[in-house]
Amino acid sequence: ISIRGFQVDLSQQQIGITVDGIANGNSNYGGGAKANRYIDTENLRAVEVSQGTADVASRSNAALGGTLNFTTINPGMDEQLVVSATTGDFGAQKTYVRLETGEIAPNTYAWMSLSSQNNNDWMDEVGEANRDHYAAKIVSYLDDMDITAYLSYDDSHEDNYQRIYGLSQFEQNPEWDQLTSDWSGIPYIDQSYRRGWSTLRENWFAYLEANMTFGDVEVKANAYYHDNKGRGDWIPPYIVDVTDDGTNGHSELVHGNTAMGGSVLGQIFFVDANGMALTPEEGCASSLTFPYGGGGAGQDWDICSAPE
């Protein structure tokens, strides 16, 4: 699915995403979540696209550039068990099971599903992506009211790809993002170790919705819950300096010490045996042009560091 919108920076996105018309936070970089955190492909009914400025009925967190509304399937009328298994290249595997309950109460139907999937990255097959997903939906058809409830839980661990920063890097090798597959033990190199660039996330999403009809008037109301927790991993070749040690060595690097936070005073790269910071020799520059497009990559500390 491709939709034209606009994005000011990594923390702002103007393409709205809803699930069954329900808001679910944002999908931005740095804490947001895409629709596949809340819906399994096998439970997807349709994707409704609103181009341009979104419909006034959209309850998305960001919808100035259009909305994608991902809708889930409704429970079937008959009891049945749906099972699927998928395999593919690069260690791709997925197992999916859904139980259709049939009628569990007068005019009330439900389904429950679970799935587990994993695959390796396609560049060097070192990075991994693992995901477990659980979901359930129940619908009750009453005389003048339909009540729908949905719950999903998603637990994922994804080793990431790095973006390509320019034509020269693409021409060098269009099928490599320049993250490395082997741990060298050298921080300058290992900041690009693929398995250190990871996203770990648990997502909960639930809603309860009622559709009511009063003559020619239709009223829709819902309550929803959304929660996510996790972290994003990367391997900078430094430790943040939060302790003012004066002329002494950096205490953050002394075994057994615990730095309890504080204001950021700088960054600690390489030190000598006494914990004293080393600085690059004059004129010694980095040959590393990735990650971050070379920005923040630092100097070749291992070959041109000297005591301050």
Which stretches of residues belong to each language-model region?
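Short acidic/polar hinge/loop motifs at secondary-structure boundaries
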Residues: 22-51
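Transmembrane beta-barrel wall of Gram-negative outer-membrane proteins
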Residues: 80-82, 87-163, 167, 197-213
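Surface-exposed, low-complexity loop segments enriched in small/polar and acidic residues
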Residues: 222-308
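Transmembrane beta-strand segments of Gram-negative outer membrane beta-barrel proteins
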Residues: 44-49, 61, 65-67, 72-87, ...
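Flexible, surface-exposed loop regions and adjacent strand-edge segments
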Residues: 128-133, 164-175, 179, 236-246, ...
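Extracytoplasmic loops and strand-loop junctions of Gram-negative outer membrane beta-barrel proteins
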Residues: 50-52, 79-82, 117-121, 186-194, ...
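Outer-membrane beta-barrel transmembrane strands
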Residues: 132, 191-234, 303-308
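Extracytoplasmic beta-strand/coil segments of soluble accessory domains associated
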Residues: 1-23
